[in-house]
């Protein structure tokens, strides 16, 4: 008798699971889950990696906080752009960096930005100010936090490090910024940026 009850229970559970899977598959929620699974499991492109000996031939600059001043360091680098700027950022609330990006757009530099989805709700995010300046700003909606802090200038210079583009990073936190002038390395970062953009549609 116990065996029959156990068998019945197993069949009943399998039946319920089958219905649930069927409903999910044909509902908007189920479709969203499936699409998110597809996006998150899309294999990333193969991007060239670099070792120290290769990078040692590049021109490298650094900035650290404290003391403050790295936002100006970054803004000055943005001011050197002549053709293009690609940014991938988690936090984007610094006024000086925002102004430098808007100035670059105004002088004819192609500026493209991908921001973490948290910027849609953050009170001090410069998302809308950048959009009003006609800068192409996309939201990185791929599952997980878009925690990159990267700026690619003229496809030959990379700004990266721990430094979020925020006032807190400049005034309160212990952070670092590194600028590497190397066209091949910049292309590696650009391919990663383009990959993230493509995965967001």
UniProtKB/Swiss-Prot annotation:
Q: Which residues form the active site?
A: 147, 149, 154
Q: What is its EC number?
A: 3.1.4.4
Q: Mind telling me which GO cellular component terms the entry cites?
A: extracellular region
Any single GO BP term: lipid catabolic process
Enzyme class name: hydrolase
Which SUPFAM superfamilies does its entry note? Phospholipase D/nuclease
UniProt-listed InterPro entries: PLD-like_dom (IPR025202), PLD_domain (IPR051406), PLipase_D/transphosphatidylase (IPR001736)
PLD phosphodiesterase domain residues are: 142-169
Q: What is the protein's major site of localization?
A: secreted
Q: Does the keyword Lipid metabolism apply?
A: yes
Keyword tags: Hydrolase, Lipid degradation, Lipid metabolism, Secreted, Signal, Virulence
List the Gene Ontology MF annotations in alphabetical order.
phospholipase D activity; RNA endonuclease activity, producing 5'-phosphomonoesters
What assembly does the database describe for this protein? Homodimer.
The similarity annotation says: Belongs to the phospholipase D family.
The protein in question is named Phospholipase D
Organism annotation: Rickettsia bellii (strain RML369-C)
The organism that produces this protein has a lineage beginning with: Bacteria, Pseudomonadati, Pseudomonadota, Alphaproteobacteria, Rickettsiales
């Amino acid at each position: 008798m116990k065996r029959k009850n156990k068998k019945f229970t197993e069949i009943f559970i399998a039946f319920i699971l089958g219905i649930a899977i069927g409903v999910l598959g044909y509902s908007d929620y189920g479709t969203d889950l499936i699409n998110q699974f597809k996006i998150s499991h899309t294999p990333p492109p193969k991007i060239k990696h670099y070792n120290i000996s290769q990078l040692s031939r590049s021109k490298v600059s650094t900035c650290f906080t404290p003391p403050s001043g790295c936002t100006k360091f970054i803004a000055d680098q943005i001011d050197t752009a002549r053709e293009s700027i690609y940014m991938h950022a988690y936090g984007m609330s610094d006024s000086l960096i925002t102004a430098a990006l808007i100035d670059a757009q105004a002088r004819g530099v192609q500026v493209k930005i991908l921001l973490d989805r948290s910027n849609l709700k953050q009170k001090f995010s410069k998302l809308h100010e950048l959009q009003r300046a006609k800068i192409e700003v996309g939201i990185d909606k791929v599952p997980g936090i878009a925690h990159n802090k990267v700026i690619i200038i003229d496809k030959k210079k990379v700004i990266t490090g721990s430094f979020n583009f925020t006032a807190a990073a400049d005034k309160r936190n212990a952070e670092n910024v590194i600028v590497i002038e190397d066209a091949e390395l910049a292309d590696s970062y650009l391919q990663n940026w383009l990959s993230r953009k493509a995965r967001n549609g």
